[in-house]
Amino acid sequence: MGKKMKKIGIIGAMDVEINIFCEEMKKNGTLKKTECGNLVFNEGKLCGKDVVVVKSGIGKVNAALCAQRLILQFEAEKIINTGIAGSIQQNLHIHDMVVSTDAVYHDMDATAFGYGPTEIPQMHTSAFDADEKMIEAAEKAFALSESAKKYKLIRGRIATGDQFVSYSEQKSHIEEICSPACVEMEGAGIAHACFLNKIPFVILRCISDNADDSYEVTYSFNEKIASEECAAVVLKMLEFLD
């Protein structure tokens, strides 16, 4: 019997973040859809790898539950979270990308009980570390991408919360408590599920807005193109994963 291929899970919160993968699997004739509850899991091959691509929906709980099902039911052995984010660091601009060093919940606050900012009670952690080999694969893929000709990729912390960060005071507070590179609404939920299941993960995000009062102009204009730029790097990244 041949050796069973490892499956790679790819999660995006919105259709626009995963469409490129489904279209590629449709083109190569490997796409198989499986409905589980309100989730649709798209199985197939990309870059010679067995993948399962799924839209989680927006928010931490949706993302964590999606990751858990991907691990248990579809036997994903690695998970990539792809999508868009708002910049927190001043040196990050629209269309730049962030590959996660770790992920935190910026809205986790049990400091009244002596825990540190973002620290999860009774878990002895405030951040979930991404897999180094997957980080390196993302960096290699970005270096070969069209995006690298105009934009940059940095390593950094991803901050997650059930809030769309859209004003400067909110942004400053998040920067103060956990010093992330960018902010979004799913990554730490996925990272949390991977941590509990001992599954390697990485989050790759393309900057769509500045997480401030300018979001009405920047986000709507950049949502689609930033999502597709990120997905293109993830697609290339698969070539560098075992």
What kind of region is each of these model predictions?
Residues G2-Q68, F74:
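N-terminal short beta-loop-beta anion/metal-coordinating cradle
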Residues E77-I80:
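Structural motif
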Residues I88-C178:
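Mid-sequence, gly/pro-rich, charge-dense loop/helix-turn segments that line enzyme active sites
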Residues R69-Q73, N91-L92, A191-P200:
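Alpha-helix C-terminal capping segments
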Residues Q163-E216:
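A C-terminal functional module that forms or caps the active site or interfaces directly
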Residues A211-D242:
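His/Asp/Glu-rich mid-to-C-terminal helical/loop segments that flank catalytic regions of hydrolases
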Residues E24, K133-A148, A193, A232-F240:
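Generic non-transmembrane alpha-helical segments
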